[in-house]
Every structure is written in C-alpha cells, then in structure tokens.
C-alpha cells in the first residue's frame, strides 16, 4: 500500500482533531461568498448613482458574478480533486479577496465589472473545494451535522445580506460591501493556511481543458439565457439562441467525456439516484429561496414603502429561522431519513408561500417568508447529505462542483421565473390592485412548485433501506 493510500485510509478511520474549527472557517468563507450576492443587490442603486452606471451595467454587476461563479464550479471541484483541496481553497480565497479590493476601488464600469467576474471565478474555486473538504473530514452522523451547519451559513447568509446591505449603504457607502471582504478574507487566509489539513489528492491524471471549456461555455450560456428570460421574456430571440447554444455545448461536452481518457467528470455520477435526487432538491430549494427573497424584499420596499435598511431588519427573523432549521435538520436527518424530511420541509414551504396570498401587509409577508424559509433551510441539508453522503474521496470535489453548479442553476431559474410571474406586480404602481395580484400570482406559482416538488421527492429520494 502506498503512503497516499495509507494516509487516505487513516483519514477515513480517524476523525481529524481540528475538523470542527476547520468547518467554522470554511463555513465563514462560504458565508462571505453568499453574502456578496444579496449585499451587492441592495447596494446597486447607490452604485449606479455614484458611478453613473446605466441599467445594463447594473445588471452585469450581478450577472457577471453569477456567470463566472456558476460556469466554473465544476472546474473548481475537479481541480480540488487533482491538485489538492487546500491549494484550491487558498487560491480561490486569494482571488476573491483581491477582486473585492479592486471592486471597492472601482471608479467606473470597466474595473467594477472585471472585478465582479474575478470575484465569481475565485468563488467558483473556493466553494466546491471547501465543500469537498467538509465531505472528506466528516462521516456518518457527524457529516449530516456538519452539512447542517454549512447549509445554515449559506441559506441564512442570503437573508443576512439584505440587512447587511442596508446597513452598509446607509452608513459608510456602497464600496464597503466589497471592502468588508478584504480583512475577513485575509484573516481566513492566514487561519486556513495554518489549520486546513493537506489531505491526499483525491484523484490523479491531467486536467481536461477542452471538457472544462465546453461545460463552462454551456453553463454560462444557460445562466445568461435564464437571466435574459427574466428581463425580456422566455421567447426572446437571444434567449432562445442561448438556450439552444447551451444544449449543443452540453451535448458536445457529454460526447467528449465519453471519448477522452481523462474526463473532467464521470458521467455515470449523473446516473446515480442519490446524486440526481440531491441536485434536484438543491435546485428547487435555491430557486424558491431566491424567488421568495426577491419577492419579499421588492414587496416591502416598493409596495409597503420600507427603506432598504428597514427591509433588512425585517429579514433578520428570516435569516435566523433559516439557520436554525438547517442546523436542526442536520441533527435529525439520520433519525428520520432524507425522504421524510424533504417532503415535510416542502409542505412547510408551500404553506408559508400561501400566507401572503391569504393576508396582506408587512406582518403577513414576513411571517409567510419566515415559515417558507424554515422549510427551505432544511431542504439544503437534505440536498447536500443525499448527493454527497456516500461519495468516494476521489469524487468529492467534482460531486461538490455538480451540487454547487445546480445551486446556481436554481438561483437563476428562481430569479427568472419570479420576475416573469410577478411582472404585473412589479410594473404596476404601488398600492394598486394590479400590483397585489401580481405578487399573489407569483406566490401561488411558488406554492405549486413546492407542492409538485414534494411529490417528486417522495418518489425520487431513496428510502433509508435503499
């Protein structure tokens, strides 16, 4: 047996003594990546006013990050398998932190957009590599608890970003939504360089550059098509062209993976029921969460006349409930099983979406979103534990990349679907019946999606005996 094999076997049998502090550091890094989405969204109006950015440029401040993040995550996961997760975590953190500094210093659109794309690339390296470390450091019930904490920080971070974005833009200014990442990133860099175990490389071979380019192009085309569909309609000519281009690129990627001796990923992973179930749940949960956060924050600011800061304060219970539900789900998952927990969580989510339809006003909106968020927080744990619960060490990085990619797919689908469903409410004037009907329609669509997903999850997620 080789030294590498011995180390790998030992790591699998003996829990790493610093695994919980490492989880805390990696979770904080993931929180920073998730916060960067909603914090920036809240600060967009202030950026536009100060830098004289038009609507297209502001859209790309968000889209550029999402495109780079989503399209490169499979590559990030595979590089973690090939070159070592620690090396890729630190490289991603360095790139993200440096890009955050550049974004805060930006005095116009070119530097800001370049920095945002670079942030997304750094996040795409960091996120799947960090998740693969969590999967390899923990096993059994401990893995469920660890994934619960990971999901709590990710899910709660999206809601906390609304509050943090309001506080920063009302205080030191929009640039600090980026500058705040610099000291946090540097502290994490020093701490992780010292504490993150240098796990044996999970896979050998060379990096499949053509495969990485094909899947990145396909994913970027699909995410951009979804973004455009939300703004310009699902039958927009360019959106349809992008959807077709994405399908063609994915087909070419699949064909190349079957031919090349060192593929980027084993396509048989996508034939495993737990992986398929996990990516289905993560996509649905993310789509619903992004959708409800978009709807809730827009309703509170444009329909109830709350400012950005007050909207952030109102979202604080949503963040706390999400984090508590995810942490709790990680503790009970082994006892009740993923299938039962997913169905219950989706039923709770659907019930929460109905509250703003049946009652109107700020209290009803916050209550409904909080109830829905409790179900969604649990779903993130179910998704991660189902997809990653039994992966081999050499597949941890690429499988984490797949899960993370479908997280971004879900976010893009959620934003596009909600934007379309609520178009009447968003276009209408504040306080009119048309606006209220538009929001009701969007929440009814979300309710239907959650209910349908519960039925699919009951069939798709393996039972505990399988």
Which residues fall in each region the model found?
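12-transmembrane solute porter fold
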Residues: 19-44, 55, 61-65, 130, ...
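Hydrophobic alpha-helical segments
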Residues: 50, 86, 98-102, 217, ...
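Interfacial helix-loop-helix linkers and transmembrane-helix boundary segments
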Residues: 80-87, 143-146, 201-207, 263-271
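Membrane-interface helix caps and helix-loop-helix hairpins in membrane proteins
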Residues: 109, 173, 198-204, 229-235
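Structural signal for the C-terminal ends of transmembrane alpha-helices
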Residues: 130, 134-138, 193-197, 226, ...
């Amino acid at each position: 047996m080789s030294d590498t094999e011995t180390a790998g076997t030992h790591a699998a049998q003996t829990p790493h003594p610093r695994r919980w502090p490492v989880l805390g550091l990696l979770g904080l890094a993931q929180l920073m990546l998730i916060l960067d989405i909603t914090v920036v969204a809240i600060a967009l109006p202030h950026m536009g006013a100060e830098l004289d950015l038009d609507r297209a440029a502001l859209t790309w401040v968000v889209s550029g990050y999402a495109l780079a993040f989503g399209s490169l995550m499979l590559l990030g996961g595979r590089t973690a398998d090939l070159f070592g997760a620690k090396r890729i975590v630190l490289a991603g953190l360095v790139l993200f932190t440096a890009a955050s500094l550049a974004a805060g210093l930006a005095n116009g659109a070119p530097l800001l957009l370049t920095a945002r794309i670079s942030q997304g690339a750094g996040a795409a390296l960091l996120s799947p590599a960090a998740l693969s470390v969590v999967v390899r450091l923990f096993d059994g019930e401990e893995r469920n608890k660890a994934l619960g904490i990971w999901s709590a920080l990710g899910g709660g971070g999206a809601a906390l970003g609304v509050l943090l974005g309001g506080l920063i833009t009302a205080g030191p200014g929009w640039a600090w939504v980026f500058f705040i990442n610099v000291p946090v990133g540097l502290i994490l860099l020093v701490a992780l360089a010292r504490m993150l175990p240098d796990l044996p490389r999970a896979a050998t071979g060379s990096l499949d550059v053509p495969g990485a380019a094909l899947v990145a192009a396909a994913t970027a085309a699909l995410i951009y098509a979804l973004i455009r569909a939300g703004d310009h309609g699902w039958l927009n000519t360019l959106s349809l062209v992008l959807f077709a281009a994405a399908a063609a690129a994915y087909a070419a990627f699949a064909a190349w993976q079957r031919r090349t001796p060192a593929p980027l990923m084993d396509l048989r992973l996508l034939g495993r029921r737990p992986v398929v179930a996990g990516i289905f749940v993560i996509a649905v949960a993310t789509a619903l969460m992004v959708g409800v956060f978009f709807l809730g924050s827009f309703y509170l600011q444009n329909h109830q006349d709350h400012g950005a800061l007050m909207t952030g304060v109102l979202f604080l219970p949503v963040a706390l409930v999400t984090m508590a539900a995810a942490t709790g789900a990680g503790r009970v998952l082994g006892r009740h099983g993923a299938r039962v927990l997913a169905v219950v969580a989706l039923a709770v989510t659907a019930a929460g979406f109905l509250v703003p339809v049946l009652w109107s006003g700020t209290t009803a909106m916050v209550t409904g979103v909080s109830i829905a968020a409790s179900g969604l927080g649990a779903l993130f744990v179910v998704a991660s534990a189902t997809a990653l619960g039994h992966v081999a060490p050499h597949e941890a990085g690429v499988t984490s990349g797949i899960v993370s990619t479908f997280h971004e797919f879900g976010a893009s689908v959620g934003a596009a679907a909600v934007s379309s469903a609520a178009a009447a409410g968003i276009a209408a004037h504040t306080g009119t019946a048309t606006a209220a009907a538009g929001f009701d329609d969007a929440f009814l669509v979300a309710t239907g999606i959650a209910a349908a997903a519960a039925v699919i999850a009951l069939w798709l997620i393996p039972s505990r005996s399988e």
